[in-house]
Swiss-Prot record:
The gene is gcvP. GO terms for biological process: glycine decarboxylation via glycine cleavage system. InterPro entries: GcvP, GDC-P_C, GDC-P_N, GDC_P, PyrdxlP-dep_Trfase, PyrdxlP-dep_Trfase_major, PyrdxlP-dep_Trfase_small. The keyword Membrane does not apply. Its EC number is 1.4.4.2. It catalyses: N(6)-[(R)-lipoyl]-L-lysyl-[glycine-cleavage complex H protein] + glycine + H(+) = N(6)-[(R)-S(8)-aminomethyldihydrolipoyl]-L-lysyl-[glycine-cleavage complex H protein] + CO2. Belongs to the GcvP family. Its cofactor is pyridoxal 5'-phosphate. Keywords: Oxidoreductase, Pyridoxal phosphate. The keyword RNA-binding does not apply. It comes from Agrobacterium fabrum (strain C58 / ATCC 33970). This is Glycine dehydrogenase (decarboxylating).
């Protein structure tokens, strides 16, 4: 008889520690993997991989790791320090109701939030359709021809609009006009963007201060930040007469009732879709939009979803006109944008699908009527309301009573907007209740009931909308929640995300987004805080941001962090601006040269161009390392004007370079600063710190290293860390410190997703984060070893190791049997995998990054699939398979292939069920291989007519 083990309570350890869940391989599996790699211990592998010259001297420690429950309790305690009042502050941020069917089935659904940017369109058809709906909705409401699939926020979109105006204008002027009625954060970002490019920004009343001859473009706010609704038709016509371009920042909800920018003649419309069901979240994330006239579509920044056909001629969606983007055109790109806000754009599009045009118009009418009722009550109290006609925002002159009324409103549970020294503004919205109006009246000294007033309209009659919008059937088919739920499910079933399989994209770090980390983002204490509330109402946010910043400083060796950049590309831009402003403050106005290796990610040169720097490329050696001799030569050659260098570490080739310290020393010797791209930080956390190596500034991709999900192409966060001498030059914001240099609309970027990264740090602890880095390196080296022999691993260190990712060479297959890297990628779809990163940083190769979250079983399944693909290529090489009609060339295979007529020289079994593919719950690509050329030559970027859907169903 077995004696039970004696249990002592002091031995008890909770089982819900995150590192037990987050790290994929078990200790026994790690031992097996280490044996394959050739090391007896994980530490021995790390010692052989990470150069001792850069190793972190002090372990990463900041207290014990918390369990999931303890971390959630800590988050709840912190969230409760935020005060959730009703905010009528407006200024581009409004209360909205997220339909529960959208919250549960999209925002909280890993099938949507764990997907990657849809570069592989065959396995992204659901998301692409949702984004096409978004583009269609935006085009209809703005009255323009083509819309993109989102930008980062409204203010950033305005800055992008200015840059686009300059690109396409026939005018040779160097100034840009900004309507003084634009939101303050919009004006601030435009000024930030214009300064390094040498453009003058003129701010004023467009009806009295704008001379079209003086500008290459202008932007107008519609309605204005203080409520004015103006007709810009005449001004736009005058701008066109001088070759200038007109942009309008428009409220989508208002456009259901008001004449569209397109009908006024605008070339560009921008704005935010936040009030279409996306919580304010202390400033973000939200999806901005941009729409343009057809003539300007190739100059528009951001992703653009278009319609094409697959190999069977069936309709299929894809990203169109990608040659405009930074990964192709580099410093000549339209923008440095990499991804934007796909998840939030999907939510906004579904808001439109669910409510339809009648529902959205009804919400707009109710919002306007609330504003009119508010105005009537204040007028009864003797106050004068500005403007006379408005949509949702009014401004009240209160004189010396401003402070008293604002405080009284807060006591009533309402935040109002301080306007100048003597006025108060308020913006009504979908969530405004009758009790809120009565509370505001009390704050002004009145004691009215909403029943005391009759609603009416105060919209300008000559600007009432008469044109139709959202007429496509998709906006009329899903009013019943049962149908809406099924529609969302049908779309998600067409996509491949982390909830189905590993996504081994190199330089993308598709790691686990733990459910416990995601839970707090929908708590009202985080999601319902306006970004411009008084500081004492956001003490929980301050505590979280301060602690996360401190932890990131500990991880990186930097002295200060700014959370403002709301993407990695925006982080690069902010970091380079910080360097530029540092040089300007120290007399270095001439320092404008940026050294960038030719292997760098396309955002690097694109970002450098945006801050007015001249990009000087540096050679890369055959082994993938920066050519130190060429770097030294260029640094000496441009020493007088050297501003900085931009490097990635580990390198973009997936190797820890031994010369990184020397590169930093050379740069500093010649007066430059070092920008170290933090995209590969998942290989460094706990092992090496950029600030110790010699770097001056980095951005971190919190949506990579620190677990914020990619959302199918956003949201992201790209906070920047700097050494102490650069800290005074970090981005400011007009609503907080009043300093210049804002790079995002909100002071802290997209803070409502920061609980994800903070809880990840709390639950992993310093020791857990370090272990995660080590396992990420183990997993990458294990894959390199397993694929060795079948494929060449292009870049390794002197010890034969890779960092957290590896590049395998598929070019020999193209030479031996005509199999391209695209064929390999599409065949992986048949196996149930998203392809690794294709043709970057080396054309014709695959960059593989498994992350620490993947189990040995999943990694082995991927390796088995890759090895099977090599054997299929060998069949072609040795004549056992037709060179043009084989599983690789015909991939991906669909259900239609399986059940249709089969005229191929290989079996259905071989085509549809390759090694690595699950049989019972296999993922089937919804379309065959998509024709990219057709899609660009026959560009359609709005929903096809209903007949196309009917034809597809036949």
């Amino acid at each position: 008889m077995t004696t039970p083990t004696e249990f002592h309570f002091t031995d008890y350890q909770p089982y819900d520690f995150a590192n037990r869940r987050h790290i994929g391989p078990s200790p026994s599996e790690m031992a097996e993997m280490l044996k394959v790699v050739g090391y007896k211990s994980l530490d021995a592998l790390i010692d052989a991989t990470v150069p001792s010259s850069i190793r972190q001297k002090v372990p990463l420690t900041w207290g014990a790791a918390l369990t999931e429950r303890e971390a959630l309790d800590r988050l709840r305690e912190t969230a409760n320090k935020n005060q959730v009042l009703t905010s009528l502050i407006g200024q581009g941020y409004y209360g909205t109701i997220t339909p529960p069917v959208i919250q549960r089935n999209i925002l909280e659904n890993p099938a949507w939030y764990t997907a990657y940017t849809p570069y592989q369109p065959e396995i992204s058809q659901g998301r692409l359709e949702a984004l096409l709906n978004y583009q269609t909705m935006v085009c209809d409401l703005t009255g323009l021809d083509v819309a993109n699939a989102s930008l980062l926020d409204e203010a950033t979109a305005a800055a992008e609009a200015m840059a686009m105006c300059q690109r396409v204008a026939k005018s040779k002027a160097t100034a840009f006009f900004v309507d003084a009625n634009c939101h303050p954060q919009t004006i601030a970002l435009i000024e930030t963007r214009a300064a390094p490019l040498g453009w003058k920004v003129i701010i004023g009343n467009p009806f009295t201060d704008l001379d079209p001859v003086d500008v290459f473009g202008a932007i107008f706010q519609y309605p204005g930040t203080h409520g004015h609704v103006s007709d810009f038709t005449g001004l736009i016509s005058r701008l066109h007469q001088t070759g200038a371009i007109a942009a309008v920042a428009a409220d989508l909800l208002a456009l259901t009732l008001l004449k569209s920018p397109g009908e006024m003649g605008a070339d560009i419309a921008i704005g935010t879709s936040q009030r279409f069901g996306v919580p304010v979240g202390y400033g973000g994330p939200h999806a901005a939009y941009m729409s343009v006239k057809d003539a300007h579509k190739r100059s528009m920044p951001g992703r653009l979803v278009g319609v094409s056909v697959d190999a069977r001629g069936n309709r299929a969606y894809r990203l169109s006109l990608q040659t405009r983007e930074q990964h192709i055109r580099r410093e000549k790109a339209t923008s440095n944008i990499c991804t934007a806000q796909v998840l939030l754009a999907v939510m906004a599009s579904m808001y439109g699908v669910f409510h339809g045009p009648q529902g959205i118009k009804a919400i707009a009418q109710q919002t306007h009527q609330k504003a009119v009722l508010m105005a009537k009550g204040l007028e009864k109290l003797g106050y004068t309301i500005e403007p006379e006609t408005f949509f949702d925002t009014i401004t009240v002159e209160v004189g010396h009573m401003q402070g008293v009324i604002l405080r009284s409103a807060v006591a009533e549970g309402v935040n109002l907007r301080k306007v100048g020294a003597t006025k108060i503004g308020m913006s009504l919205d979908e969530r405004t209740r009758p009790a809120t109006l009565e509370a505001v009246w009390r704050a002004f000294g009145g004691n009215f009931s909403i029943s005391d007033f009759e609603p009416d309209y105060r919209l300008p009659k000559d600007l009432l909308r008469t044109s139709q919008y959202m007429t496509h059937p998709i906006f009329h088919m899903n009013r019943a929640e049962s149908e809406m739920t099924r529609y969302i499910r049908r779309l998600s079933d067409r996509d491949l995300a982390l909830d189905r399989s590993m996504i081994p994209l190199g330089s993308c770090t598709m790691k686990l987004n733990a459910t416990a980390e995601m839970l707090p983002i929908t708590w009202p204490e985080f999601s319902d805080i306006h970004p411009f509330v008084p500081a004492n109402q956001a003490l929980g946010y301050k505590e979280m941001i301060d602690d996360l910043s401190e932890k990131l400083c500990s991880v990186t060796g930097y002295d200060a962090f700014s959370m403002q950049p709301n993407s990695g590309a925006q982080g690069e831009y902010a970091g380079l601006l910080t360097i530029r402003n540092y040089h300007l403050a120290n007399g270095g106005t001439h320092r404008d040269v940026c050294l960038i290796p030719t292997s760098a990610h396309g955002t690097n040169p694109a970002s450098a161009q945006m801050v007015g720097m001249k990009v000087v490329p540096v050679k890369v050696r055959d082994n993938g390392d920066i050519d130190i001799d060429d770097f030294r030569l260029k640094a000496e050659q441009y020493a007088e004007n050297l501003s900085c260098c931009m490097i990635t570490y580990p390198s973009t080739h997936g190797v820890f370079e031994e010369t990184v310290r020397e590169i930093c020393e050379i740069t500093h010797k010649h007066g430059g600063q070092v920008y170290l791209d933090g995209a590969n930080m998942n290989a460094m956390v706990g092992l090496a710190r950029p600030g110790d190596i010699g770097s001056d500034v980095s951005h971190l991709n919190l949506h990579k290293t620190f677990c914020i999900p990619h959302g199918g192409g956003g949201p992201g966060m790209g906070p920047i860390g700097v050494k102490a001498h650069l800290a005074p030059f970090l981005p400011g914001h007009p609503t907080t410190d009043g300093r210049e240099g804002a790079v995002s609309a909100a002071p802290f970027g997209s803070p409502s997703i920061l609980p994800i990264s903070w809880s990840y740090c709390l639950m992993m602890g310093g020791e857990g984060l370090t272990q995660a880095t080590k396992v990420a390196i183990l997993n990458a080296n294990y894959i390199a070893e397993r694929l060795k022999g079948a494929y060449d691993v292009l870049y390794k260190s002197e010890t034969g190791r890779v960092a957290h990712e590896c590049i395998i060479d598929t070019r020999p297959l193209a030479d031996s049997c005509g199999v391209t890297v695209d064929d390999v990628a599409k065949r992986l779809i048949d196996c149930g995998f998203h392809a690794p990163t294709m043709s970057w940083p080396v054309a014709g190769t695959l960059m593989i990054e498994p992350t620490e979250s993947e189990t040995k079983a999943e990694i082995d399944r991927f390796c088995d699939a890759m090895l099977a693909i090599r054997e299929e290529a060998r069949d072609i090489e040795e004549g056992r398979a037709d060179k043009n009609n084989n599983p690789l060339k015909n991939a991906p295979h669909t259900v239609e292939d399986l059940v249709g007529e089969w005229d191929r020289p290989y079996s259905r079994e071989k085509g549809c069920f390759p090694p690595g593919a699950f049989r019972i719950d296999k993922y089937w690509s919804p379309v065959n291989r998509i024709d990219n050329v057709y899609g660009d030559r026959n560009l359609i970027c709005t929903c096809p007519p209903m007949e196309a859907y009917a034809e597809a169903a036949e």
